[in-house]
């Protein structure tokens, strides 16, 4: 983990490699998740930086167990075991930043009114380096980005423009 608390957001190439690495591990364990936040915006084609990987996850005990197993194997770290099954539902964001890595992963149970069950109704599977990544669809991603932060406003302009260009409702 970097001492400044920022993840691997400095380089788009490095971040893409991290996203692929994380999603490959999650897919191999059958974890139910959707990429949201800045990484989802990037995967939809907007060039921006982000310092973390945001994952909207199914908060069932079985799924959290699979997620923890995937991260233990990927990062060779027991730090993930500190996260309790109920944490995803209890906290707005559960942050995992393995000591040995320059990566920050935010696990989220709900963004506003959007939970995993809602998000999977509108996902786009984007393939990167042969790995299928479930990414939050445009309409749902727009809903999750209706915040007041300047970067959310920039993301919204891009997402709404892309949605209009593609003619999606």
What residues fall within each predicted segment?
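Compositionally biased terminal segments of proteins
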Residues: 1-169
